[in-house]
Amino acid sequence: MPRVPDAVSYVGRNVSDCGYCASPDASVSDGAVAHGLSTKRYGELIDDGWRRSGTWIYKPAIDVSCCAQHTIRVSVDAFRPSKKQRQVLRRLDAYLRRERDEGSDGGDEDGARAARKLEITTARSTFVREEFELWKRYQAAVHGDEASELKEASFRRFLVDSPFVEDETPNETSEPSIGLGAFHQQYRIDGKLVAVGVVDILPKGLSSKYFFWDPEYAKLSLGKVSALKEIEFVADERRRRPEATREFEFYYMGYYIHDCQKMKYKADYAPSELRCSTTNRWVPVDDADVQKKLDAREHCRLSDEAALPRECCEPLKSMVGLALRGQLVSVTTLGDLPGLLESIGVNLGSSRGVRRFADEQAEWCERSGRAGMTIMNLVDIERNLLAYEDSDEVDEHSDDELAGIA
């Protein structure tokens, strides 16, 4: 069966140990399994505070989490590299220009010494064995991961899989030249793979997901180089195709965490702005008042301006996809759900299952914002509706069957 566009299975709120400050059971987020999403819909989710890891999408709950995570982006047209960032590029350039030491003069027939060559290529996300081997070396050397933990399945799930449903032929009038979706950018020096950038190319800009590099090239600061090259990618597209890329103007860096030094550096790419989760406004991260609020841990409201209207789907009009034993049965609205279930012979008895699901659907509508108006929430009749009739506990089985129909 073809993948279902704009469909998720909302899981709800999740509490886990924090990966930034290591506090136990202190990181809180809302999550969903994304079976299929257009890049436009995912872009709307990003602007509402969501992010993805493979096909898992999540939104940190800033008001109750230990480390407040704010979506951060840069307007590429306004970006100017700092002195330190220019030094990073000069260091790379000096390395590339330096004569290669290959045990010989390395020259051509005329005796000239050849410089190194850096090539950056962008291709749609797919599993590449060479990338996987580089990722394992990076994770072991930089993050201290055990070799036994570095599985191909984890690499695929985290860095290759995506929920995007896109036409691979770019729209010449309204998209970047390479198209939209999930991509890997390979960095090669003289043909050797030295780094990989995992990015999403969305209607409004490039979203940087992950970057890994060869530990032998640590002195080149390739992580900083990649951010500058990704910004340059957006700028180049805007220069070459101004009409097609009028909205393609931002560089998204994921989340900014003011209290975490390894995440705070993102504000160095200036001028950058943070999303205020209360007012739905974007505020300059270097604004004095914003900095005071961040220093005082007043994370919920970064802007003193009035809140912008936030569109949300009316729960009874929201879309619900019904699955039964791994097959999509029907698509309906929450308001029409009870009648549809009766029409296909599903006896809900007290209907407690539908009422409980209705509460979860209302929560999804509120937390997904505008994007949720056109995203279907896929639910399994037996595991998620009928299960509620016999138990007060939420069924926590995997979403493998739902993933199979999407």
Regions found by a protein language model. Give the residues of each.
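A conserved beta-strand-loop-helix scaffold within acyl/acetyltransferase catalytic domains
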Residues: 53-56, 60-64, 72-219, 318-398, ...
